[in-house]
Amino acid sequence: MKKTYIRALDLRHGSVDLSHGGGGRAMVQLIGEVFGRAFDNEWLRRGDDGAVLPAPAPGERLVMATDAHVVSPLFFPGGDIGCLCVHGTINDVAVMGARPLYLAASFILEEGFPLAELARIVASMAAAAKAAGVPVVTLFVARTFATFSGGFGCCPSSTPRR
């Protein structure tokens, strides 16, 4: 069945409005057209609020880290808030002795934030996640701009904890 929306999403000149964080059709459209295209994978295609992931192998433990990124400016020499979010979270999992496996992401978007800049940040996150081989398997969008992320990995049971 084809999804229908009230209006087309103008990724070049449009901006985020309150309906994009309201849980309705506008949010579904934003997630599908911006996030879904960039992070496309089997978990996100299901459209669920979470992801059911395989259990760690026998002899391994699950490692999880969470992070938040609020920086100004959002784009800076050498990167942006998107790649910082992915690399920072993957690093937090790795320093615990784990092999990063999955990412969860939350976006708090300000009303009026340019959709072109959002698409650029999401593309940067997707490129960083793809380069690391760590997919974003669940995400959330709400109102006002910040990124939050969680990372999951596995490590041998014998790995010492800090």
Where are each of the predicted segments found?
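N-terminal glycine-rich phosphate/pyrophosphate-binding loops that anchor nucleotide-derived ligands
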Residues: M1-V95
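Glycine-rich anion-binding loops of enzyme active sites
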Residues: L62, H69-V70, R99-R162
